[in-house]
Curated annotation (Swiss-Prot):
Protein name per Swiss-Prot or TrEMBL: UPF0301 protein Mvan_6057
Spans through the membrane: none
Family annotation (Gene3D superfamilies): VC0467-like
Family to which this protein belongs: Belongs to the UPF0301 (AlgH) family.
Domain of life per record: Bacteria
PANTHER family (alphabetical): UNCHARACTERIZED PROTEIN YQGE, UPF0301 PROTEIN YQGE
Annotated signal sequence range: none
Length: 201
């Protein structure tokens, strides 16, 4: 299989700078098990650092067993997702708003980007339900101190890309990492064909 000629060909376009609502895709050389082929949605990026959640790491723990009041709104497979290695005992919730819903001033919702919001898990699910297409709940998160993520991006550990609202709720059976790459322009889209098992290469 043909391989990229030069890793520098796959540096994120200048327009894609890290901010809330962007995604970090693990580059093919990032083989550390926690983040290999991971897709991280950036929730916060400011002077205090960066916080995001891994979108494609489902666990086997049912939402109902942890937060039963939110199980009805959770999208399939209705399990907790592993948001990252930090504070695994803490839960963070993202949702995609229905088209036309404005989250401004709504108790329990905090706008992230576009139709994506953070949901306060202490809120009443019944009050949130009419406004969202579904929720996804993460155990833990991924975090970087000031300058740490920038260093990893310069090292080409991460590809910075824009996100679609639908990316947040994609079912685990979909290879989200490859799907996002396939919709990018050449030559970046070539990375989508990179094998999951390196032994196949």
């Amino acid at each position: 299989m043909a391989q990229p000629e030069d890793p520098e060909d796959f540096v994120a376009p200048a327009a894609y700078r890290v901010r809330a609502g962007t995604m970090l895709l693990a580059n093919t050389d990032l083989l550390e098990p926690t983040f290999r082929r991971s897709v991280i949605y950036v929730v916060e990026h400011n002077d205090g650092g960066t916080l995001g959640v891994v979108l494609n790491r489902p666990s086997e723990t049912a939402v109902y067993n942890v937060l039963p009041q939110w199980a009805k709104l959770a999208t399939k497979p209705k399990t907790m997702f592993i948001g990252g290695p930090v504070k695994r005992d803490a839960a963070l919730c993202l949702a995609t708003l229905r088209v036309g819903i404005d989250p401004a001033g709504v108790d329990g919702l905090r706008h992230v980007q576009g139709r994506v919001v953070m949901v306060d898990l202490d809120a009443d699910p019944d009050s949130i339900a009419p406004m969202v297409e579904g929720v996804r709940i993460f155990a833990g998160y991924s975090g970087w101190t000031i300058g740490q993520l920038e260093g990893e991006i310069e090292r080409d550990d991460w590809i910075v890309l824009s996100a679609l609202p639908s990316d947040v709720l994609v079912e685990p059976r979909v290879d989200l990492w490859a799907r996002i790459l396939r919709r990018q322009p050449m030559p970046l889209s070539l990375l989508a064909t990179h094998p999951i098992d390196l032994s196949r290469n």
